[in-house]
């Protein structure tokens, strides 16, 4: 046995087995770091299925990652029989597998914010962040235990790695025959492993194949590994137009084109949109007063007080899981399907927004975000979507009478309290009517607040909750100033979150809860605007654009994938989102899950909040919902690929 492990072929097999162990160890760490997302639904049967899937995906990733090492180790040339060459092979092996391990460990933390494994677009998401090195350094200190695990595993890998013994005496003919045959066999096995199987019916496995090993889409993150998810999505076209139905049927079933009636009368009111970083519904007492209110003390008391005098919705959802998903959804009515719109070639399409449409009515429009200009691609999207001006950290710092170095949080942006005061003061200088939007920043990882407030806000059960309370206080201070201004009573205020964040209640950790965000419309100066709490309407972020334009009486056609929440026909309301290769449609009492080919899940979410009872093929609404969702997907993909997300003039 010792002789075999010291041979080139034997040592290579041993080292690949070691790589398998490291991949599986990383998966166990991922599982236990995110234990509360998976444990309530886990049983032995599911665990066995997931293990089978994990081995399949690890095989593909392992062969991708170790391809260079395998080539170096097994290439049939006798001149490689040298200590220096074998040391080079060892270094290549350890470095490549270290990168893979790092990706898996990083995703153990990042998953809590995205609900999925990272894909190739992750490199573009942070490409505009000038402080990315500082952010990573802070994360290393916060998650020191993962850094320690990484170092220990890499040192152990270096120690356990099997280096073949150097052969000085061998028959060259036999050597080349033996090693050539081995090399050809290994190449063949590697091709099969990378594809995920053998046979004409087997297509190269993709992320979506993970769904066959799980009961819930979110569980695919355990089956997958980060290297596979990244490698398999490099260069992949995000939007493929399906042919579920002919165009006539598609348009009759669903159309994102909104055509107001000829009798519509436009009223030029101001519009102010707040995209509150990570303000998930879980942190609200108002939105959780129905079920176990004692478990929801609430960390956004001011926004809750606004909600009581607004039009709000018990069932309201985001259309993505990241900040770069939230902005197109809220302002342009574009949901996130497959990959963030920002990061796809479709981002070069002509795109509109609330601002872009209101420019047609001579509005002044501006977007505000306290991070460095260019951060997250927000400035680029704001300008493409029609905002006339952008106010970021550069503009804030240019105000010498206002700016102090302590106004910067040290990681991401200007503190919300200071920046929202800047926002209010700037709006006081704008000519009416205006439309503005602000994207807050302080309720964000690494979950810190100004030192002067360290003992001011309750800690909560997860670190973000005190940050939500701080940003809520900053919002209250904004309104203390804004309500004294002349423009205030002629303004519609809209509030939502970009996405959800840390959770500690099980109902907010499943495929529905991870998308639950508040949607609030507040018009303090409009006596005809009646506050209402709707329990019969499904609301989503992409409804905000058509709802705002409907409220104003906008009389020009436009494209938005949502619908007006002020439409009296509640049967039209729905929500869509996408995660881990699964499309979701929320309509009436049900949530339908669809993998692009067929329905894989159906739940009565109003009765089954934890989504434990899959009632697929048991309710008559399923097939109508599936047909509707197919029409939405086909419209979306077709319009993205043909640049039809605006009305052509």
Where on the chain are the PLM-derived regions?
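Soluble catalytic regions of membrane-associated enzymes that act on cell-envelope
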Residues: 199-560, 568-573, 579
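Short, function-defining helix-loop hinge/capping sites that tune catalysis or transport
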Residues: 35, 66, 115, 285-286, ...
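Residue-level recognition of alpha-helix termini/interfacial anchor residues
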Residues: 140-144, 423, 453, 617-623
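Short, hydrophobic/amphipathic alpha-helical patches that form generic packing surfaces
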Residues: 53, 101-104, 228-233, 631-635
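Membrane-interface soluble catalytic domains
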Residues: 205-206, 526-649
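Transmembrane and membrane-interface helices of multi-pass
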Residues: 2-224
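Short, motif-level signal for alpha-helix interfacial/capping segments enriched in acidic residues
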Residues: 85, 254-259, 476, 582-587, ...
